[in-house]
Amino acid sequence: MINLIITLITNSLLSTIIIIIAFWLPQLYLYLEKSSPYECGFDPLGSARLPFSMKFFLVAITFLLFDLEIALLLPLPWAIQLPSPFTTLILSYCLIMLLTVGLAYEWIQKGLEWTE
């Protein structure tokens, strides 16, 4: 029991010391590049009302939606080991078909074209 208490106290002290050093150390060296905000290549000191491409925004949102839907397929190798792999196969097939139909719809509506 005493070994457990010593281990917990030692781990707590070490983690506290490391956290204090991590908060204290970066404040010693401030460079101009580190102290200026940087946001995706845009000048942070310029106007906040810059024109923004709506087409770029729509393509980015479309990418995020498809990316999140594909992330639903990641647990499939583990889901196949369930007692009813046929249900998993049907659900994954439906999800892939939904992705294919969504991509076809975006393609037909010219949502992935940059020029009009």
Swiss-Prot record:
Its EC number is 7.1.1.2. It is found in: Mitochondrion inner membrane. InterPro entries: NADH_UbQ/plastoQ_OxRdtase_su3, NDAH_ubi_oxred_su3_sf. GO terms for cellular component: mitochondrial inner membrane; NADH dehydrogenase complex. The chain crosses the membrane at residues 4-24, 56-76, 88-108. Gene3D superfamilies: NADH:ubiquinone/plastoquinone oxidoreductase, chain 3. It is a multi-pass membrane protein. Keywords: Electron transport, Membrane, Mitochondrion, Mitochondrion inner membrane, NAD, Respiratory chain, Translocase, Transmembrane, Transmembrane helix, Transport, Ubiquinone. One of its GO terms (molecular function) is NADH dehydrogenase (ubiquinone) activity. One of its GO terms (biological process) is mitochondrial electron transport, NADH to ubiquinone. It catalyses: a ubiquinone + NADH + 5 H(+)(in) = a ubiquinol + NAD(+) + 4 H(+)(out). It comes from the Eukaryota. Core subunit of respiratory chain NADH dehydrogenase (Complex I) which is composed of 45 different subunits. Interacts with TMEM186. Interacts with TMEM242. Core subunit of the mitochondrial membrane respiratory chain NADH dehydrogenase (Complex I) which catalyzes electron transfer from NADH through the respiratory chain, using ubiquinone as an electron acceptor. Essential for the catalytic activity of complex I. Belongs to the complex I subunit 3 family. This is NADH-ubiquinone oxidoreductase chain 3. It comes from Didelphis virginiana (North American opossum).
